[in-house]
Design a protein with these regions (language model features):
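Central cavity-lining transmembrane alpha-helices of secondary-active solute carriers
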Residues: 50-68, 116
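Symmetry-related core transmembrane helices of the 12-TM Major Facilitator Superfamily/SLC fold
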Residues: 102-103, 168-182
Length: 182
C-alpha cells in the first residue's frame, strides 16, 4: 500500500493520527469537564466549546500565513506541536481556574492552528517530485485515513480512562441510572 510513496507519508500519517487522537479524546469530555469542574450550565460550556473550535480554524489562517511567509512548513508544524503540548500540560493542572483553562484552550488552538493546515501542505510537497506525482491522490487518502483512525478510537479511550478512574477510586459508573429516574 505504501510501497511507491515517500517515507515522509508514514510520518505524516502517524503524526496526524496521534494529534487527532489526543484532540478528540479531549473533545469527547470537554463540555462535561467544564460543567462539572466549574459549574457552568450547558449553554455556557457549549459556547466555550464553540469558541475553541472557532479559534482553531481562525488561527489556522495565521499558521498558514506564517508558514507561507517563512517557507518553513516543517518548523511551523514543530512549533505547533510544542505549543499544543504546552496547552495540554496547562489543562492537566488540577487547581487551574476557569480563566486558566480557557487560556490553555487558547494555547491549544494556537498550536493546532500552526499544525493543522501545514501538515497537509507538507504532504502535498512530498509529491511535487515527478517520481511520486501520480501517487498524490492515494497519498491524501492514506493521510486522511490517519485522521479517521485517530478520531474513531479517541472517544472509546476517553470512556475507558473514565471507567478505569472511577473503578480505581471506588466509584461505579452505571449508564442505566438516569433512565431509572424517569
Amino acid at each position: 500500500m505504501l510501497k511507491n510513496h515517500p517515507k515522509g507519508l508514514i510520518v505524516a500519517f502517524f503524526t496526524n493520527m496521534g494529534e487527532r487522537f489526543g484532540f478528540y479524546t479531549m473533545m469527547a469530555i470537554l463540555v462535561l469537564f467544564l460543567q462539572v469542574k466549574y459549574g457552568l450550565d450547558e449553554k455556557v460550556a457549549g459556547d466555550y466549546y464553540s469558541w475553541f473550535y472557532f479559534a482553531i480554524y481562525a488561527l489556522s489562517l495565521l499558521g498558514g500565513i506564517l508558514a507561507d511567509w517563512k517557507k518553513q512548513y516543517k518548523t511551523v508544524i514543530l512549533y505547533g506541536q510544542i505549543i499544543m503540548f504546552v496547552g495540554y500540560v496547562m489543562m492537566a493542572i488540577p487547581s487551574m481556574s476557569l480563566y486558566g483553562t480557557l487560556g490553555a484552550l487558547l494555547v491549544i488552538s494556537l498550536g493546532n492552528g500552526f499544525f493543522k493546515g501545514n501538515l497537509q501542505a507538507v504532504v502535498g510537497q512530498l509529491y511535487d517530485d515527478p517520481k511520486y506525482a501520480k501517487f498524490r491522490d492515494s497519498a491524501f487518502m492514506v493521510f486522511y485515513m490517519g485522521i479517521n483512525v485517530g478520531a474513531f478510537f479517541a472517544p472509546f479511550v476517553a470512556t475507558g480512562i473514565r471507567n478505569w478512574w472511577l473503578e480505581t477510586n471506588g466509584f461505579i459508573h452505571d449508564g442505566s441510572l438516569p433512565a431509572l429516574c424517569h
